[in-house]
Every structure is written in C-alpha cells, then in structure tokens.
Amino acid sequence: MKLGVFTATLQNLPLGEALDVVQALGVESVDFSTGGCGTKAHCDPEALLTDPARLDRFREEVLGRGLEISALCFYGNPLHPDRDVALVHRRELRNTILLAE
C-alpha cells in the first residue's frame, strides 16, 4: 500500500509548495480535488484539458518530485435538485473523467 496526501488540505498553498510539503512527508502519491463541492485550487480539469502546455506543466510538477497521482476526487451531485448546480457538477464530473483517461 502506498500512502498519499489529499492536496485539498493544502489548498492555501500554490501547487508547487503543496507538492513540496507532500514530498517532505515522504509519501509517494497525491490525490487532487477536481470540483463539485471541493476545491479546484491545484487541479482544474477544464483548464488542464483545454491547455496542453498547462497539463504538461501540471504533470511535471507532480512527476518531477517523484510523486504519482493516485486519485482525482470529484465531490459533487450531478443529480442536484437545482438544475444549474446539477449542470455545473455534470460538466465538472465529465471533465474529471476525461482528465483521468
């Protein structure tokens, strides 16, 4: 089993600094929140999917520290009773799945 850190707990830090903390803890992997009710501070799937250079930099930030991505965590409700919220959550869930491919 590998230990990892859910980076949303470090959302007040820029991505690089958050990953430095994770690396200093000696863990091997990171989980990223990707939207819904969670933060997209470190991993915004829509932004990463529409900008290949940004996606490459994101990967390098993680892999360059010897870390791996163990999970993309979407916390939302695509069946939310408020249609506007449901549509946003559906889009964010879809983008999370596409990013995971």
PLM segments and residue spans:
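N-terminal pre-domain/capping segments
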Residues: M1-E101
